[in-house]
């Protein structure tokens, strides 16, 4: 079965909000074996919406609409689809009572336009809105299925999970779709693809989809099977083949981001961490503290942006700052070692470099040094040559910090 997602709302076309509903629905539909080949966005205009409906009917079995179910004049989705299908709109008594009770409870006037939210297509399966007012609905006609959902994600997502997915499962073949994301760092997308190109070229079931994202590369493995455990076996076989070739760059699965993996390993090792941040200006420490329970391993950090802080707080010798510069291997080494000592941690990590857009100390933007000092281990400094905008360089530097921390922790 093929579906098309039609998002209705001029605010989407103006870029005022992102179409996160389409991403959510595509992922959920794929998991139950429904293909999505088109996303359409159309403004609050009945003529253009009608054209979008006609185009979708030519290429999809299931048309899923988000948005346009509210009380205002520009909420046109129900009316346009009713006219297109030559169906009446009727009041759903449960929804009408829910809306009426809300206005009574809040002491507000229950106006005629608010009643509009309780209108549904005649004969439709009604999906209760447990987090808002306008119900969703599903109707089958002319060998097509039309699903109408509210636009706000906080209403649409729980409605889909509770009511729409069970409704849609009636149209699926019973095949389950199982996906696993493999995460890699320290290798470019093109390099990784070359190493697994024959597997990508020969893919059938499971499929392999590479994606590069801000210094990382992921491979999404997706298998179809009526039995979930069999789908998992198919994926495991391909994963084993991939990791035989590029396993040195692999660090985690699915939502296991670098900062999470590094901090979890710190906890398991029972070690503590401190950071000295010049270039990154607190980005690294901020990501550290996104992890719950991190106070057991994170002593704190020093944002040593000015050379005075490097010299007087973290004791980088004046000679190093004048001779080698703040952006240097020697400075990164002192910062990592001394923040570890000052904050009495087991591990010190440091970041210094040039984010751009201009050069500094006659060093080009993207020149970066990450220092890592671990007790009873020699200090290591990792030189990096990064590209991108100022913000991208800073964010990628922080990621490299987590990556090198994770890899060193694996070794000890």
Curated annotation (Swiss-Prot):
Superkingdom of the source species: Bacteria
InterPro entries: CinA, CinA-like_C, CinA_C, CinA_KH, Competence-induced_CinA, MoaB/Mog-like_dom_sf, MoaB/Mog_dom
Family assignment from sequence similarity: Belongs to the CinA family.
HAMAP family: CinA_B
Listed name of the protein: Putative competence-damage inducible protein
Organism: Bacillus cereus (strain ATCC 14579 / DSM 31 / CCUG 7414 / JCM 2152 / NBRC 15305 / NCIMB 9373 / NCTC 2599 / NRRL B-3711)
